[in-house]
Swiss-Prot record:
Gene Ontology CC: one annotated term: extracellular region
Gene transcribed to yield this protein: EPYC
SMART domains hit by this protein: LRR_TYP, LRRNT
Function: May have a role in bone formation and also in establishing the ordered structure of cartilage through matrix organization.
Residue windows of the LRR repeats: 143-164, 167-188, 191-212, 237-257, 258-279, 289-309
Family: Belongs to the small leucine-rich proteoglycan (SLRP) family. SLRP class III subfamily.
Positions of disulphide bridges: C117-C129, C278-C311
Tissues showing expression: Preferentially expressed in the zone of flattened chondrocytes of the developing limb cartilage.
Keywords from the UniProt entry: Disulfide bond, Extracellular matrix, Glycoprotein, Leucine-rich repeat, Proteoglycan, Repeat, Secreted, Signal
Signal peptide: 1-19
Protein name: Epiphycan
Amino acid sequence: MKALARLIVGLLILDAAVTAPTLESINYNSETYDATLEDLDHLYNYENIPMGRAEIEIATVMPSGNRELLTPPPQPEEAEEEEEEESTPRLIDGSSPQEPEFTGVLGPQTNEDFPTCLLCTCISTTVYCDDHELDAIPPLPKNTAYFYSRFNRIKKINKNDFASLNDLRRIDLTSNLISEIDEDAFRKLPQLRELVLRDNKIRQLPELPTTLRFIDISNNRLGRKGIKQEAFKDMYDLHHLYLTDNNLDHIPLPLPENLRALHLQNNNIMEMHEDTFCNVKNLTYIRKALEDIRLDGNPINLSKTPQAYMCLPRLPIGSLV
């Protein structure tokens, strides 16, 4: 048995020796093995390797093109929901914003088919139409609060020019050619605070709203019948009343208690009564608010009626001779 075992071992050793590779079959780079130690750094200098294409590090396995991603693709329903979320903007509370309503960004059309805010200048709730050679009030946006149309050629104010403008607070039509105003042109404006109509040709004032605080109708043609009786009586918030350079022959009475300034210079006022400003039945009455009265340029002698000023904090400005 020992002889048989030795025979088998010998055959295995012989087979291994026969199948072993010879030196001629080994391929190697002789230049590398013949290099000196000083040249080895040059052979393995990676800084000089061109970077024009991507390099693969040793022991790094590139994923094959057929390899499936670990994250499964979204289901059809989920994909539709994601698309809807991306296309529809959401508010903080998760609701969808309302579609904006466009009601004429440039305002209503004028008679020349131009939007008012293209012909004029609209800034927030203020409309400026100064010096545009307008001959009529243009249609105004509903939210207009302040309207300026100075230095134009407007001749008439119609009752519908400011209709339904419930937020209108100031109207300034200085230096036009206005000679006629419809009776209801201003009366139905619930928020009107300031009315400026100076430098026009107005002969008759229409009924005005009691909400007015500032009125300037200077340099017009108001005469004896130009202002209605008790026109300013119920204007409890009226502070300034300017009627200079007209043809008035009397002071329009009664005047509001809170009036601060009354300018009537350069009219035709010839007389004044003791109760024009004061209460003759109450000698202790003092009219504290009315500090600015201008009567200069009128044919009136203020010295003839001294009792008319006893309740005033300051004497009116005017002729004393």
